[in-house]
């Protein structure tokens, strides 16, 4: 089972009040519902989902809210994965239910935004977001993918209203248009965690946080290791260059041409190629020299070697 499926399963098990129930149903019916008319039978509402837990949730909420007869149908998809499609069918009072949920207006006109009557308080707003995620939400597994939560809406008006509602809770949701509809998405890990908590997926939120913290720790360690490796490579590269320059001077003009303080450091550097500058400074017989002092003397040796290579006089470098 995917992480998103586990989140949805948890959401379908949340106990809610009657007011929250209608808000959640409003999102499910608006986003997953289809309306049809038939001669002699009036309006029929079908709410479809490929998730059995969500189908049971829709069925039980409709029964509890409106006490109408419902049909539960199971169809097989003919394309791709050929999953089961569960359809909760409402034949009785479908028009009244849709009007009560703020989806159907006067004269059977569709209301594509979110009715204010559904979002009277924070608990109902949270319930609507829960229903929206159950209907069209997806969430990447934080352990194996980048952080990404999204909710699909068919209509731009609903997507805009959903984004506005989401951002009332400071979740920094963004919107984008796709070929078949509109997407609301959240990419910040902290905001995704806040969304899960907001809609009531507490256990999933804690799991998400565990993975996120561990992932962030690993990334921090990797950055630290990479930084230390880069510094080590830089140090090793500098040491190799210094030794090469000292050996070049020894072969060409001899180390005796160097001032005593530079000659001493040159001999120590060649003899102890794997030690740090600080350790090298502690080996000076006349008394310890700071890391910056050792570095200064080695740079002078590098300058002298460069002048010899270029056929220049050493005078300015001594």
From Swiss-Prot:
Belongs to the WhiA family. One of its GO terms (molecular function) is DNA binding. SUPFAM superfamilies: Homing endonucleases. GO terms for biological process: cell division; regulation of sporulation. Involved in cell division and chromosome segregation. HAMAP family: HTH_type_WhiA (MF_01420). This is Probable cell division protein WhiA. The keyword DNA-binding applies.
